[in-house]
UniProtKB/Swiss-Prot annotation:
Segments on the Cytoplasmic face: 36-527
UniProt record similarity statement: Belongs to the cytochrome P450 family.
EC code(s) of this entry: 1.14.-.-
Protein name: Cytochrome P450 714B3
Amino acid sequence: MEVAMAMAVKVLLSLCCVGACGLAVYLYHILWLVPQKVLAKFEDQKIGGPRPSFPYGNLADMREAAAAAKAARASARRSGSGGGGIVHDYRPAVLPYYEKWRKEYGPIFTYSMGNVVFLHVSRPDVVRDINLCVSLDLGKSSYLKATHEPLFGGGILKSNGEAWLHQRKIIAPEFFLDKVKGMVDLMVDSAQPLLMSWEERVDRNGGITDIKIDDDIRAYSADVISRTCFGSSYIKGKEIFMKIRELQQAVSKPNVLAEMTGLRFFPSMRNKQAWELHKQVRKLILEIVKESGEDRNLLSAILHSASTSRVGIAEAENFIVDNCKSIYFAGHESTAVTAAWCLMLLGLHPEWQNRVREEVHEVCRGQPVDSRSLQKMKNLTMVIQETLRLYPAGAFVSRQALQELKLGGVHIPKGVNIYIPVSTMHLDPELWGPDVKEFNPERFSDVRPQLHSYLPFGAGARTCLGQGFAMAELKILISLIVSKFVLKLSPHYQHSPTLKLIVEPELGVDLTLTKVQSVCTKRGTAI
């Protein structure tokens, strides 16, 4: 009996050893040999990059560079530099490793994160070819899909192929120009609580006050997207936006284990928080769906598509919830952050603030803002365009080769993630001139940027569907604010760009406000 037990133990141990060896070989193959083969294909094309290490690729180098940059920022804040030392180039602070590698390896280089290989592209001819590619074989990058699953799911921001094409056909018509024109009055109405609140604060503080503007602008943008696209007031949608904001924070850092192994269900503290927030957001969205009336809006279009699709109830609900979450996030967070950057720049450049204010006065002449007056605000348009050049919400245009492709003369193996650094394209002196890091809206006065040089809304087949909507929303808010207030950058402002899915001011935007006479207000009432 004892002999048999001993033999069984030996067999079991042998099997465990064989299994462990097999797992080790498999992991070595997946985490090292496979990405090395891909990197070798790029090396054959004279495309290099930093040397990866097993098993995390270049993650250690990236973290070290990011930590050093963070320490440098903290030191600068302690020294009291405040807003006086603003440089309109966030790359060394936010993405220091990419800048280092680009200088070492040129405008096209490779790197890896775990077993995921990336091609970092800032060479204009290759960027142009990527943007012009309409093949479904070039899709949205799947990297971070596991990390971002609770926020985006299978919605339009992350889907590929026929699924993405189907969603685009549903959502795109809701953001056509004629639809956006019909939303202008509603956008003006949504701005009134913000304007009245700021006016009351200025009056209460003797005609001048400091305001951290971020939350108020998010409230405005949230109200606009709720009412125009989903028919719900901000009061009803407020909880959704708060939860989505929390969810954004929860998934803003890569989950390396999930991305390398696909094990997104590992019950870490962050995963548990994200799952709980996802459940809460899902519940709130489905409640709004049940309460939705007969109004024709984006929500009704999504509901109609879900009801006519030959899928089960659970899949239909996922379709509704994932796309609502995607639109909530893209439709209010990016716009709110851009508005904050724009007001910061106007506070920093009073000459352009005056030009915009005078233009609004001349165009409106005591009448309410409407779609026609928005089209005539050329200076304001240039200011917003320049804001989007210096502070694009999206740090990258990300794509993935779903099949082997050749773009710009570069052979790209299947599965490779392609990252185009938007800020690098926007700050290329060969594309924009020697004053590339200066705020100069005049550069947009008579020149239409080339497809590969200006990417605030992406480009090509996956260009942001809501860019017309976002521009109208930004024009309305900025025009109403500058027509009522003089803006100055507060002494408390600290320049703090950071990347949390989008590039936002980590410490917010602090402005000093005083009132001015205005003729461009709600329903044409002069003040």
